[in-house]
Regions:
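RNA-binding accessory domains that recognize and position tRNA/RNA substrates
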Residues: 1-170, 180-228, 296, 344-347, ...
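Flexible helical/loop "lid" subdomain adjacent to adenine-nucleotide binding pockets
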Residues: 56, 333-379
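A short alpha-helix-loop-beta-strand transition element characteristic
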Residues: 322-330
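A conserved beta-strand->alpha-helix junction
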Residues: 216-244, 329-331, 335
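Structural beta-sheet core signal
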Residues: 171, 195-197, 231, 276, ...
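Active-site adenylate/phosphate-handling loop in enzymes that bind or generate adenylated species
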Residues: 117-122, 126, 154-166, 238-239, ...
Length: 379
């Protein structure tokens, strides 16, 4: 059996906890392709003895850790016999070991009784020395009411909240390093995403689109299922934005158009927020003043999970979640800022620059023409 532990879920109210556990069980079934997943108090169990399945389960949002365990009854003698045999198979000559025992429920023995008696039997059976500080092998015994579980490895999980427990948001994906990381961080907090990529063709080649979709496919691997993705034609609108008389506002105008498109998709999909990869001060459009001018274009919440991260931290996380290598393949995600881009745009100045462009209707038309895809996880 695989033991699945969760962290933050255990702090919720009884009703919320039950709801989140149910969602986590459904997500585990989808990720593992195993229907036999059930809950016990404070734990979820999977009918598998595969370490590969335990690793997969550890990559499901909401999971704190997993272990492949041997299940036995809760009688002390049965535990000691099974755990001694288990230890003999895993402790090599010269190894040191420690027994870590814990118990939930009413029993005639304590956790200390298990640790002391099992330790003595393992010493007798293997000749190994006890080292409680830095052992070569740890033998864990977890007694939960009428069952006990014996294991030697704890696989760290991704943590967070079960995907789908916190509603839906539109993730604005550019094809760069930052936006997939931002989307992943919100997925880890339980947010289901719909992706939106604005395709600047013919100003850039096909590689930009391909790179964005590859990044979404990596995110789909974390979802363990397809991500609905809108690919909207942005080239004609972008060309006109680059021609505005107040050319220093180019980056701000571009972002406002992207946000408008995000709002249109959110309304179609019942999403309640947008997700962007902005980091304060990283580029011209991400100064405090410019973000203020950009935000006023829509009335939806905008989640910026990377706002306080520097580039090195973002790159490190991108490598950890597997999106970095696809985000650095050759492509032109952005045509580059205008010479001397404005860093302190006022909302009034930006709105004046947009006059006559009919952006509301043109962006709505872009989204109506969007190609709607189901981006599957990479094999």
């Amino acid at each position: 059996v695989i033991i699945v532990r969760y962290g933050e879920i255990g702090l919720k109210s009884k009703a919320t906890r039950a709801s989140f556990e149910g969602r986590l069980i459904r997500n585990l079934r989808a990720a593992l392709g195993i229907d036999d997943v059930w809950r016990g108090y404070g734990r979820i169990y999977v009918a598998s003895s595969s370490r590969e399945d335990a690793v997969k389960a550890s990559r499901v949002f909401g999971v704190a850790s997993t272990s492949v365990a041997v299940e036995t009854g809760a009688e002390l003698e049965e535990i000691l016999e099974k755990a001694t045999d288990y230890a003999k198979q895993r402790i090599k000559k010269g190894d040191t070991f420690a027994v870590r025992a814990r118990r939930v429920g009413k029993h005639s023995y304590s956790s200390m009784d298990i640790a002391r008696q099992l330790g003595s039997r393992i010493v007798e059976a293997t000749g190994a020395r006890v080292d409680l500080t830095e052992p070569d092998v740890e033998i864990f015994v977890e007694v939960r009411d009428r069952n006990a579980y014996i294991y030697h490895e704890v696989i760290k999980g991704v943590g967070g909240l079960p995907l789908g427990t916190q509603g839906r948001a539109v993730a604005l994906i550019s094809g760069g390093i930052d936006s997939p990381v931002a989307a992943w961080m919100m997925m880890r907090r339980g947010v289901d995403i719909v992706a939106l990529f604005l395709d600047p063709s013919p100003l850039v080649d096909r590689r930009t689109r391909d790179r964005a979709l590859q990044g979404i496919a990596r995110l789909a691997g974390w979802k363990h299922g397809a991500i609905k993705t809108y690919v909207a034609p942005y080239g004609d609108v972008l060309i006109d934005l680059l021609k505005v008389k107040d050319y220093r506002l180019g980056c701000v105008l571009c972002k406002r158009a992207i946000y408008r498109a995000g709002k249109e998709v959110a309304e179609k999909e019942g999403a309640k927020a947008l997700i962007t990869g902005e980091s304060l001060g990283q580029v011209a459009s991400q100064t405090m003043d410019n973000l203020h001018a950009i935000d006023r274009v829509i009335d939806y919440p905008i989640f910026r999970p990377l706002i306080g991260h520097d580039k090195e931290e973002i790159i490190s996380l991108a490598k950890e979640i597997g999106t970095y290598e696809v985000s650095i393949t050759p492509a032109n995600c952005c045509l580059g800022p205008p010479p001397h881009p404005e860093t302190r745009a006022s909302p009034e100045r930006v709105e004046k620059a947009e006059e006559g462009l009919d952006l509301e209707n043109r962006v709505r038309g872009m989204v109506e023409k969007a190609e709607v895809l189901r981006v599957e996880p990479e094999e």
